[in-house]
C-alpha cells in the first residue's frame, strides 16, 4: 500500500508517521530503516529526521511487514569488547546500535547472539539489558545458578549500576533523587511515561549528580535504584533535561542522528556468584560520545571520578 502525506507543522518523521498510520514507533522505525519512506522524493533512513511544512512524505508499507517471528537467539559473529570473563560470568562493553536480545521483528544480530558465538554455542544468559543505542557495561551469566545469584543482587540493590548521561540545559540542583512511577503510554508497546499511583504505574527511582555543565548542556552521573524500561531517559525528560539525541524522549526540535541517545553505562559493581568477592568494572566512552563532550566543552574532572567509586 502506497500513501503520500503533506506536512503542515515541523516535527520528527517517526512521530509524523506514527500518528497518521496509527502505528507504534517500533513499526514506524522499521519502515524508515528498511528504506520504505521518502521525503520530497529522497529516501530517508533516520527516524529523527525533521520534516518541514509543505514537505511530501511517501511511504510504501503493509501489515505483513510486521508479522512477528518466534524469538530465537542465533549465534552472531561479532567482535566483543570483553572487560572480564571466567567460567561463571562475562562483563562486556556493549557498543551503541547493537540490541541486547533478538526481537520478534527479525532482528537477530544481538549482543546475546555474539556472546553465544564467543562461547562456542554454550548456554549464556543476559543478567540485565541495555537499550539498543545505550552503550556500556552489560553482564551475562554462563549458567542458571550464576544468573539467579546476580539477578537477586539486582532486586536487592546489591548490584550497583552507574550511567553517564549528556542532557540538555544546566540543572539547578547539583544532585538529587528522581522519584516518579513509570507506565506505558496508552497501548504503545515502546514508549513509557511518568504515571500516577495507579496499579499500572511501577515505582522508579534514579539518583543523579552533575559532573560538569555549562549554559547549553550538562554531563551527569545517574545511579539506577530500580531497573524499569527506559527509566533514566523518561526520568530526565520528566525533569525537563532530556538526553541529547534521544529519538523517543528528546527535544521535539532536535533532529536525532543514527547514533541515538547519549547515554552510557559507565560502571557496575557486584558480588561474584562463586568467588563471593566484590568486583567492579568500567567501560570507556566511544569516540562519538567523547567527541560530543569535546564539542560542548564538557569533560569529567579527574577529581569527580571518585563519585563512581
Swiss-Prot record:
Assigned keywords, A-Z: Isomerase, RNA-binding
Active site: 131
CDD domains named among the record's database cross-references: PseudoU_synth_RluA_like, S4
EC number of the protein: 5.4.99.-
Catalytic activity: a uridine in RNA = a pseudouridine in RNA
Top enzyme category: isomerase
GO MF terms, alphabetically ordered: RNA binding; rRNA pseudouridine synthase activity
Domain S4 RNA-binding: 11-87
GO biological process terms held by the UniProt record: enzyme-directed rRNA pseudouridine synthesis
Entries under Gene3D superfamilies matching the protein: Pseudouridine synthase, RNA-binding S4 domain
Family label: Belongs to the pseudouridine synthase RluA family.
Name of the protein described by the UniProt record: Uncharacterized RNA pseudouridine synthase MG209 homolog
Organism of this sequence: Mycoplasma pneumoniae (strain ATCC 29342 / M129 / Subtype 1)
